[in-house]
């Protein structure tokens, strides 16, 4: 699409316009669906950027054209979906590709369960398409807004020790590389590329096609029970995580209580009538817009009076689950799986999630709770937390989301199915702890509460042998990650180097965590580096604007 048919491109540098126009004359009219003046913002409003071009291709040939043009124009390419990662991984001042219009189901084999889809399809769209065909994904996380490529690329997971990462059912991928070529990879064909692409972090190319094994559609009967954290810890090594196929917990540190969600597969069909008997959970007036805004405004108030934060936890917990002590089953339902897994994330938030060995969960939560509550010897629930940072005057939001999985059930290094950058345990079940700090009305908590909380939280996670979730907030360094992942880290880097030697898909986030520390004489030719950042006013969405600059080394 030349600039004559797309006047918005007239604002581009003349050399870039000429490259696009020349390519449009020679490629048989393959569209280049690009626009300028797009503002990219993460879902949480934590980061924004102003890409030079925002491009929404609708076919593999269009994606290949984007990559070829970027190579000739000496531009970095970043891919984004819903922007649910609160980090700056998708921020760019160069070319931003969104695959929302590349979202079709290509084929479904009901005999094998193999489904082939275009990589831009969102998980909610995919779930609906599968349901219409009597199929489902084996497991989902708490949200379904991500594209399937984004969920794969960042290691999205659900919660249940019979399941691992959402990407565990992937059997084949197609990816468009920096040279414009689209390759297939699988455990048998180009296994190193496959293992690298399963958690690619957007640094290898653009995933275009995903083949995975679906399962017959299923419904879940779930219930939610309230218990003290002491009893949760007592049940931990008994049947806490094996009592149902899917289990997740929300822990409230100030109240020292938890909501335990359990779900099992059921057949909701009435044998007499043949009717499907789904049942929605009971609701109250507080579950409406009233509760949403009451909680939001209480969080906003706590920015100015942080000491009321534990009271807010008590009030919101009571309104949702009841104010009585002891175990109380509050709600239950029977829903289609793609609906039962979902959780309302409510408001803008920072999230910091780490994966540790499952058996270390009670120790982690007890030590974290003792630190947050400033417990002293003799206080109920006191343990020596060992965290070398003060929590005096620190008040944090709740809950801490607690989930578990076991990626060893379906994946292994030997079978070439375990991602190189899989943060889960390679020898047993994994526990995920997700520390949330809300940003009411897109404003950060005061008194550096988020930074202080995450400083202590990450110190504890490191001590317990943890690794951070790639899509969330963390402060580990490249050296830390290289040490934790060992040979797999080096092998992932070798694949990246082989498929993108000029760094077309490399930005500041990748340099920070995956590449050697920045040295001017060792920049990749197409790498984008961070030039500066600036705060965005809350009335404009808040967060930090990331401004990058290309290395722009001419090709040899």
From Swiss-Prot:
Keyword hit for Aminoacyl-tRNA synthetase: no
Keywords: FAD, Flavoprotein, Membrane, Mitochondrion, Oxidoreductase
GO CC annotations, alphabetized: cytoplasmic side of mitochondrial outer membrane; mitochondrion
Disulfide bonds: none
Molecular function as annotated in GO: D-arabinono-1,4-lactone oxidase activity; FAD binding; myosin V binding
GO biological process: cellular response to oxidative stress; dehydro-D-arabinono-1,4-lactone biosynthetic process; mitochondrion inheritance
EC number(s) stated in the UniProt entry for this protein: 1.1.3.37
Pathway: Cofactor biosynthesis; D-erythroascorbate biosynthesis; dehydro-D-arabinono-1,4-lactone from D-arabinose: step 2/2
Required co-factors: FAD
Modified residues annotated as Pros-8alpha-FAD histidine in this record: 84
All copies of domain FAD-binding PCMH-type, residue ranges: 47-217
Compartment(s): Mitochondrion membrane
Enzymatic reactions: D-arabinono-1,4-lactone + O2 = dehydro-D-arabinono-1,4-lactone + H2O2 + H(+)
Stretches that traverse the bilayer: none
Family matches, as Gene3D superfamilies: 3.30.465.10, 3.30.70.2520, Uridine Diphospho-n-acetylenolpyruvylglucosamine Reductase, domain 2
Statement: the UniProt record of this protein carries the keyword Acyltransferase: no
Family membership noted in the UniProt record: Belongs to the oxygen-dependent FAD-linked oxidoreductase family.
The protein's name in its UniProt record: Putative D-arabinono-1,4-lactone oxidase
């Amino acid at each position: 699409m030349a600039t004559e048919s797309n006047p918005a491109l007239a604002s581009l540098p003349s050399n870039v316009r000429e490259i696009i126009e020349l390519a449009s004359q020679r490629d048989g009219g393959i569209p280049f669906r690009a626009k300028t003046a797009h503002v990219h913002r993460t879902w949480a409003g934590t980061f924004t950027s102003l890409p030079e071009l925002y491009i929404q291709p609708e076919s593999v040939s269009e994606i290949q054209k984007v990559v070829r043009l970027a190579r000739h124009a000496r531009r970095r390419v970043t891919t984004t979906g819903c922007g649910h990662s609160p980090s700056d991984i998708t921020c760019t001042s160069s070319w931003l590709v969104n695959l929302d219009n590349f979202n079709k189901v290509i084929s479904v084999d009901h005999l094998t369960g193999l489904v082939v889809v275009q990589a831009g399809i969102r998980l909610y769209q995919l779930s609906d398409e599968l349901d219409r065909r009597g199929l489902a994904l084996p497991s989902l996380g708490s949200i379904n807004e991500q594209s399937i490529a984004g969920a794969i690329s960042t290691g999205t997971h659900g919660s249940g020790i019979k399941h691992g990462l959402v990407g565990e059912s992937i059997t084949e991928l197609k990816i468009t590389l920096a040279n414009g070529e689209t390759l297939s990879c699988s455990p048998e064909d180009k296994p190193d590329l496959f293992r690298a692409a399963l958690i690619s972090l957007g640094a290898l190319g653009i995933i275009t096609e995903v083949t995975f094994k679906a399962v017959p559609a299923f419904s879940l009967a779930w219930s939610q029970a309230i218990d003290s954290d002491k009893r949760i810890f007592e049940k931990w090594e008994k049947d806490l995580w094996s009592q149902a196929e899917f289990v997740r917990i929300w822990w409230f540190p100030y109240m020292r209580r938890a909501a335990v969600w359990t779900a099992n597969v059921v057949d909701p069909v009435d044998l007499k009538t043949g009717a499907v008997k789904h049942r929605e959970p009971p609701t109250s007036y507080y579950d409406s817009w009233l509760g949403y805004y009451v909680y939001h405004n209480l969080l906003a108030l706590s920015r100015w009076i942080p000491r009321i934060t534990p009271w807010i936890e008590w009030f919101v917990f009571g309104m949702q689950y009841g104010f009585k002590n002891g175990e109380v089953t509050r709600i239950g339902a029977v829903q289609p799986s793609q609906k039962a897994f979902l959780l309302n994330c409510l408001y803008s938030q920072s999230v910091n999630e780490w994966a540790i060995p499952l058996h270390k969960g009670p120790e982690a939560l007890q030590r974290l709770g003792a630190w947050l509550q400033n417990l002293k010897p003799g206080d109920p629930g006191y343990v020596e937390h060992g965290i070398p940072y003060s929590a005096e005057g620190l008040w944090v939001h709740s809950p801490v989301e607690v989930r578990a999985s076991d990626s060893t059930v379906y994946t292994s290094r030997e079978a070439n199915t375990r991602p190189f950058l899989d943060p889960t345990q390679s020898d047993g079940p994994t526990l995920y702890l997700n520390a949330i700090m809300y940003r009411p009305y897109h404003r950060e908590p005061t008194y550096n509460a988020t930074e202080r909380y995450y400083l202590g939280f990450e110190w504890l996670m490191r001590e317990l042998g943890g690794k951070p979730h790639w899509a969330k907030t963390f402060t580990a360094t490249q050296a830390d990650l290289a040490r934790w992942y060992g040979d797999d880290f080096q092998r992932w880097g070798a694949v990246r180097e082989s498929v993108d030697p000029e760094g077309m898909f490399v930005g500041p986030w990748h340099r920070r965590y995956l590449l050697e520390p920045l040295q001017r004489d060792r920049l990749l030719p197409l790498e984008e580096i961070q030039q500066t950042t600036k705060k965005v006013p809350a009335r404009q969405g808040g967060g930090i604007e990331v401004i990058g600059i290309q290395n722009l080394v001419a090709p040899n």
